[in-house]
Amino acid sequence: MIYRNDIRNVAIIAHVDHGKTTLVDALLKQSKIFRENQHVADCVMDSNALEREKGITIMSKNTAINYKGVKINIIDTPGHADFSGEVERVISMADGCLLLVDSVEGPMPQTKFVLQQAMLKGLKPILVINKIDKKEARMEEVIKLTQDLFLELATTSDQLDFPILYASGRNGIAMTELGEEGKNISPILDCILEIVPPPQIAEGTFQMLVTNLDYNSHKGKISIGRIWKGSISPRDYVVCLNADGDTNQYQVDEVFTYMGLSRLNVDKAEAGDIVAITGVDKVSIGDTIADPQNPDALPRIEIGEPTIEMTFGVNTSPFAGREGQYCTTRQLRARLYRELEKNLSLRVQDTRSADTFLVKGRGELHLSILIETMRREGYEFEISKPEAITKVVEGQLMEPVESLIIHTTETNIGILTEMLSNRQAQLTDMYNDGKGNVRLEYKIPTKGLIGFRGQFLTATRGDGVMNTIVLGYEPWKGAITSSRSGVLVASEAGTALAFGIANAQERGDTFIEPNTLVYEGMIVGMHQRMQDIPINICKEKKKTNIRSSTSDISVKLTPAIIFSLEQAIDFINDDELVEVTPENIRLRKKLLSYHDRLRNISSRRKDD
């Protein structure tokens, strides 16, 4: 077997917020990738606007550095469970991995998932205990917990023999022993050269598995992946083997490799390289691009099943078409099906209604990122409340179940216990550090997590962190009754006035400001009772020919509650929708007319 000793391919994997992207920043900066006078932002790999806003990695990305004459291809992966499909998709390009574990939090749900994926692929692991500069760091305990995780997941005895490094990605230092003085990030790079095996070069003609796609308005589709056999050059002929076994022949236009944040145009790339090629138009992630003389397909990428679903529909509100650039069924359908090309965890199905589509994903965040992306692109549509995806196994209804881990303070245990018991959660473990901080671990149905994140943040007053990961399927435990209060629903269309809002605020909280355009059936607030209340938010104060000296003093209003997209999705009930446009996020009833809603309630009672 031939090896390419001039290359190492390594993936950086971890739970969300354990410091992957910050560590990549340090590797890039200390490898002299940037000019000395060049300003470089933090988390430079998270170039997407939503990634920067939310502080998480959403899409996996490739970069490369040169160190001691060896090119190190680095694959930065997401840490959030909702984007675990990205990890499954790209981890096959690597020969080794850096597993980052927070020195305080220790192994978390996604740590187990990403390590399991790495072990199944046979990657050589390097454990990096990150954020060692934290005062609360508990090194020995975290190392023991991580070693137990390796013992549970290792598929070969070799995977139990791994080095341990200690790092502070924010400070750009790493060390092989605790107590050493960290000077730079070089110990990690030296360990990669020593531990991660060089790519094995199998004999044969060109063969590449497409693990990612990009698009350029001038170059068209860009296929990204690792070359497993042979070599490729511009103007070479190749065939693309898709999931159906069909083969289409193309001529390669350009071949790129990675260095820093750039793609470099090259005349030739060989087995072991991670490349991007143009000229292959009809290609999907998981396809094999190969030599026409020997078109052998590589095993396709297997991605886990989605766990929640919701409908996307054409906007049917009275304000439809006013604020969006893309509003039609054709445009919405084309955009959703186009997303399938690079978002492997997503599923899209047509429904009986021509203007409504069923979209399935790995979690609320997974789908909300898609919704927000489409909103910013100019799409206008409406979405329903998410639901857990059930399936029937041997005649029994099964539902997805997840592990929920919460870090908070002792004072929040009571309220969280009450909230989660109403959502069919079972407490499986609890750890108290003796300083007022607790770690709670629950097993909970996915349906019990829908809408919980917003309530969790409110109950803990922001003093808590929650993480989840899917465990599998268990028998259906029954429906969960909504505990949400009733809403205030606009009974007339028009412009919301201060007098009308003041009247509404006597009944509850409002969601809109004065001078907001509203329509009948739009949700404008909430109150404490369980029933919905129709209210005329456009009501004016009656005029008389007699005025007192204080009659025209302006009305004092409580500031409106403004929902983010995620909060709006969490808030709605089954009979409600979120109207999404580039300019506004509105809540509404599915049936806008008050009389239609009454008839619907009456007919359901008769059916019961």
PLM ranges: what are they?
Residues 258, 263-266, 398, 444, ...:
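Long insertion/accessory domains within large nucleic-acid-processing enzymes
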Residues 1-101, 105-107, 141, 145, ...:
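P-loop NTPase switch module centered on the Walker A-proximal segment
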Residues 207-310, 320-322, 485, 494-543, ...:
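Conserved nucleotide-binding/hydrolysis modules and their immediate coupling elements
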